[in-house]
Amino acid sequence: MANIKSQKKRVRTNEKAHQRNVAVKSALKTYIRRTREAIASGDKAAAEAAFAIAGRKLDQAAGKGVIAKNQAANRKSSLALQINAM
């Protein structure tokens, strides 16, 4: 355990950031899963609507540094390819 005051604060702030990042990643997984389920069901309109939300959330997560920008781009590209193949 840290003894220095500033380090104690860093431990607290790091834990808050960790909790926030876990929540954002969990939400991302949910939106991506909804998009994949819509693709699997064959409903192109629902898939495109879900993809619009998922793409926006991926960009937000990349902007906040939760995931890398390339990872967001790769995931969006993969989902877009699947939707276009419908």
Swiss-Prot record:
A Pfam family assignment: Ribosomal_S20p
InterPro entries: Ribosomal_bS20, Ribosomal_bS20_sf
Keywords tagged on the record: Ribonucleoprotein, Ribosomal protein, RNA-binding, rRNA-binding
Disordered as annotated region, ranges: 1-20
GO molecular function: small ribosomal subunit rRNA binding; structural constituent of ribosome
GO biological process, one term: translation
Annotated S-S bridges: none
Transmembrane segments: none
Residue ranges, compositional bias (Basic residues): 1-11
NCBIfam families reported for this sequence: S20
Family the UniProt entry places it in: Belongs to the bacterial ribosomal protein bS20 family.
The protein's name: Small ribosomal subunit protein bS20
Organism, scientific name: Bifidobacterium animalis subsp. lactis (strain AD011)
Gene that encodes the chain: rpsT
